C-alpha cells in the first residue's frame, strides 16, 4: 500500500516526507491555501530522490499549463479534481489520478474512468475540492470494481487511518490536513501516519 502526502510547500517539509519514506509527494497548483508556484515546485522537486513520485494537483487547468508544468517540475503523475473530459485526459502524457467525490454519482463516474488511479474524497465543501479534513462513510467503497486502483482520501489522520484501511483496503492513501498542526505540515505526524499505515495489524 502506498502513501501520498499532499500539499507540500517547502523544501523542509518535502525532506520530512522523504525521510518518512512516503511513496508520493503532492504539489497543489489549483487555487488553495496550499497552492504553490511552479517555480517553487521546481525548486523543491530538484531536491527529491527519484524514489518518490511527484504528483501535480489541478482543477480544470488549461491543458497547455499542465503540459508546461509537467516538463518544468518533471512530474510523474497528474491528479485531476475537476470536470476534465476524457479527450483532455488522453492528451496528458503521464499517468493520471482522477478524483471523484464520495457520492452515488461520483462512484458511478469512477467506475467508468480509465485513469490509472481513482481517488475518492469527501464531497466538496462549498467551492473547496479536497484537503478539507472531513471523512465520509468508508463502507460505500466496499466491493467497488475499482478497489485495485483506489486511493482513499478525505479526513484521514494518524488516529483513523488503521480503521480506514481495515474497512476499505485501498491501493493507496492520500493525506494533507491530517498531518498538519495549526495549518502547517508536522514532520512527527507525517512519520506517525506512515508508520500506522505500515503496521501489519491494519491489513485484512
Swiss-Prot record:
Instruction: Please list the reactions this protein catalyses.
Output: N-(5-phospho-beta-D-ribosyl)anthranilate = 1-(2-carboxyphenylamino)-1-deoxy-D-ribulose 5-phosphate
Catalytic EC class: isomerase
InterPro entries in the record: Aldolase_TIM, PRAI_dom, RibuloseP-bd_barrel, TrpF_fam
Q: Which CDD domains match?
A: PRAI
Q: In what pathway does it function?
A: Amino-acid biosynthesis; L-tryptophan biosynthesis; L-tryptophan from chorismate: step 3/5
Supply the alphabetized keyword list.
Answer: Amino-acid biosynthesis, Aromatic amino acid biosynthesis, Isomerase, Tryptophan biosynthesis
Superkingdom of origin: Bacteria
> What are the recorded Gene Ontology BP terms?
L-tryptophan biosynthetic process
Amino-acid biosynthesis as UniProt keyword:
yes
* EC number from the UniProt entry: 5.3.1.24
What GO molecular-function term can you cite, just one?
phosphoribosylanthranilate isomerase activity
Keyword check for Transmembrane helix, yes or no. no
Task: Quote the HAMAP family the UniProt record gives.
Answer: PRAI
Q: Which NCBIfam families match?
A: PRK01222.1-7, PRK01222.2-2
Family, per the entry? Answer: Belongs to the TrpF family.
Q: What is the protein's name according to its record? A: N-(5'-phosphoribosyl)anthranilate isomerase
Amino acid at each position: 500500500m502506498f502513501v501520498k502526502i499532499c500539499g507540500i510547500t517547502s523544501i523542509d517539509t518535502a525532506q520530512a516526507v522523504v525521510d518518512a519514506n512516503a511513496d508520493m509527494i503532492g504539489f497543489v497548483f489549483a487555487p488553495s491555501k496550499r497552492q504553490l508556484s511552479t517555480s517553487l515546485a521546481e525548486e523543491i522537486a530538484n531536491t527529491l530522490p527519484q524514489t518518490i513520485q511527484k504528483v501535480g494537483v489541478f482543477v480544470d487547468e488549461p491543458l497547455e499549463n499542465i503540459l508546461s508544468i509537467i516538463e518544468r517540475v518533471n512530474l510523474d503523475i497528474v491528479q485531476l479534481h475537476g470536470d476534465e473530459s476524457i479527450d483532455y485526459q488522453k492528451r496528458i502524457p503521464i499517468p493520471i489520478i482522477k478524483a471523484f467525490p464520495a457520492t452515488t454519482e461520483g462512484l458511478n463516474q469512477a467506475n467508468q474512468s480509465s485513469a490509472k488511479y481513482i481517488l475518492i474524497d469527501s464531497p466538496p465543501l462549498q467551492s473547496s475540492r479536497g484537503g478539507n479534513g472531513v471523512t465520509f462513510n468508508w463502507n460505500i467503497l466496499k466491493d467497488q470494481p475499482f478497489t485495485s486502483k483506489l486511493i482513499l482520501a478525505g479526513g484521514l489522520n494518524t488516529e483513523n487511518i488503521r480503521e480506514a484501511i481495515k474497512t476499505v483496503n485501498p491501493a493507496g492513501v492520500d493525506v494533507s490536513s491530517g498531518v498538519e498542526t495549526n495549518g502547517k505540515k508536522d514532520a512527527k505526524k507525517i512519520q506517525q501516519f506512515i508508520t500506522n499505515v505500515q503496521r501489519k495489524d491494519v491489513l485484512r
